[in-house]
From Swiss-Prot:
Cleavable signal peptide: none
Reactions mediated catalytically: Hydrolyzes single-stranded DNA or mismatched double-stranded DNA and polynucleotides, releasing free uracil
Residues forming the catalytic site: 64
One GO location term (cellular component): cytoplasm
CDD domains listed in its UniProt record: UDG-F1-like
EC numbers for this chain: 3.2.2.27
Protein name per UniProt: Uracil-DNA glycosylase
Keywords associated with the record: Cytoplasm, DNA damage, DNA repair, Hydrolase
Catalytic EC class: hydrolase
InterPro entries in UniProt: UDG_fam1, Ura-DNA_Glyclase_AS, Uracil-DNA_glycosylase-like, Uracil-DNA_glycosylase-like_sf
């Protein structure tokens, strides 16, 4: 069955492509030269570590990792416990408060509990230089994450794609809407959230879709690992 495939199964060949090896080499060279690159090396592929291919129910596409100290840890929109909640995630929490009964905004921005339920939190570029947004946008990560989206499209069925903002929507243009459920809205950034992200109801609609397919809905209340044990 397709859902038994792992990321390793479907990405092993891609990871041997010259462009990908060049990307890794460029990032490694920058780190070795003393440039601070986020997230830390051990966290770059966390989205795949926490959400196996066969478990993917929802895909949320981010763009660049956060470029401030201690923020990025390999999951789009998420920050480690103890780090201030970034504005886009605060707006996501506002939308959840307004649409999910009983949701109360947590005091942290750590979304690992979403990832472990099957929400792939995928940035389209997986590294960034400290303080320099989009500094790694042309390194080859976009080619890799295009492949990831293509593989989900091909090997899974009935996945909900939440595409916020023009970048994510262009990235998701290849998704087969007969096989998957695609929801679009403006980005939750303070610059655009009032243009239709607020009120998009995506978190509710995603769960309704999953329930219609007989799948367990996502508990959108982010819990820290110690709280969920």
């Amino acid at each position: 069955m397709a859902n038994e495939l792992t990321w390793h199964d479907v990405l092993a060949e891609e990871k041997q492509q010259p462009y990908f090896l060049n990307t890794l080499q460029t990032v490694a060279s920058e780190r070795q030269s003393g440039i601070t690159v986020y997230p830390p090396q051990k966290d770059v592929f966390n989205a795949f570590r926490f959400t196996e291919l066969g478990d993917v129910k929802v895909v949320i596409l981010g763009q660049d990792p956060y470029h401030g100290p201690g923020q990025a840890h390999g999951l789009a929109f998420s920050v480690r416990p103890g780090i201030a909640i970034p504005p886009s995630l605060l707006n996501m929490y506002k939308e959840l408060e307004n649409t999910i009964p009983g949701f109360t905004r947590p005091g942290h921005g750590y979304l690992e509990s979403w990832a472990r339920q099957g929400v792939l939190l995928l940035n389209t570029v997986l590294t960034v230089r400290a303080g320099q947004a989009h500094s790694h946008a042309s390194l080859g990560w976009e080619t890799f994450t295009d492949k990831v989206i293509s593989l989900i499209n091909q090997h899974r069925e009935g996945v909900v794609f939440l595409l916020w903002g023009s970048h994510a929507q262009k990235k998701g243009a290849i998704i087969d809407k007969q096989r998957h459920h695609v929801l679009k809205a403006p980005h939750p950034s303070p610059l655009s959230a009032h243009r239709g992200f607020f009120g998009c109801n995506h978190f509710v609609l995603a769960n309704q879709w999953l329930e219609q397919r007989g799948e367990k809905p996502i508990d959108w209340m982010p819990v820290l690992p110690a709280e969920s044990e």
